[in-house]
Amino acid sequence: MMTPSASHTNLSTHERYMRRCLHLASHGLGRVKPNPMVGCVIVQGEEVIAEGYHQCHGQWHAERNAILHCPCPERLEGSTLYVNLEPCSHHGLTPPCADLIVERRIGRVVVCNDDPNPRVNGLGYRRLEEAGIEVTRHVLEEEGRWLNRRFFTFQEQQRPYVILKWAESADGYMAPNYQPYWITRPYLKMLSHKWRTEEAAILVGAGTYRADHPQLTARLWKGQNPLRIVLGEVDAPEGWLQLPHQSIADTLHTLYERNIQSLIVEGGRKILDAFIHSGLYDEVRILRGDAHYGAGLKAPHPDSLTINPSNIHYYV
């Protein structure tokens, strides 16, 4: 039997274990793309008997990690499995998790988010139900969607999740005297490199590339370098993806077809304005320095005409 949401009686218990799932899942940030981040907790009575999370793309999913690393496998029968995404029921790089859950006679599955991927999308629930496993859905649903916002945007909107990022002075200038200049404190440069490891790709326009010849690597933080993209006609080095000058919508469609789930845009004013005016972005990350320049290249200034409820904006 499938229940649409958790009952009020068990809500606090379900939320406690689901929050643990989300915490475990978050360890996969930047490592599992383009897969979603998933964590799993298995409970027998009031005791956690196993945990796991999806650690790297191509490796075992969270449910399989938890089940196969359970120190007392005989206790899995009749247990409750918490997972923040609908278990898969198809063969991909790894076997289906739903089959393993059925095989180990787990009694109940509690889920945070449905999986919109057409290869799953309810089929995991069906497999569990047909085996007589009770399924409870939508526990901490909004928190789960936020954690996997890249995945859900990619699946539902068929484009990468887009983050616009720039640095500006205290009075809103990107560069004094229109010249490249490092505005913020050194530790924020490290933060910028950390952010790069979390996204699949990074993009600049041809103007920024010609002026700055940026490396766009994550050399100050441990993790994978993003795919480096330049938009426009330049002589880009090997290892970069060069895309022709085209609309933002067409650019994002091209990246979607290349299975690029998320994108951070670190271009200059022109390319940032193009994304802002298109409305095809999800976050704005602004690193604000302490200095006042009084003149120079003004930073973008999204207004109420370009902001919609799905955009998230914050300052660091």
Task: Mark where each language-model region is.
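Short, flexible helix/strand-to-coil boundary loops that buttress conserved ligand/catalytic motifs
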Residues: N113, N148, Y178
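Short, hinge-like loop/turn segments at secondary-structure boundaries
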Residues: R126-E130, T153-Q155, R219-K222, H301-D303
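N-terminal glycine-rich anion-binding loops that anchor highly charged ligand groups
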Residues: V32-E46
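Short capping loops/turns at secondary-structure boundaries
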Residues: N117, N121, R137-L140, Q155-R159, ...
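Zn2+-dependent cytidine deaminase-like catalytic core
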Residues: I42-E143, L227, V234, A274-I276
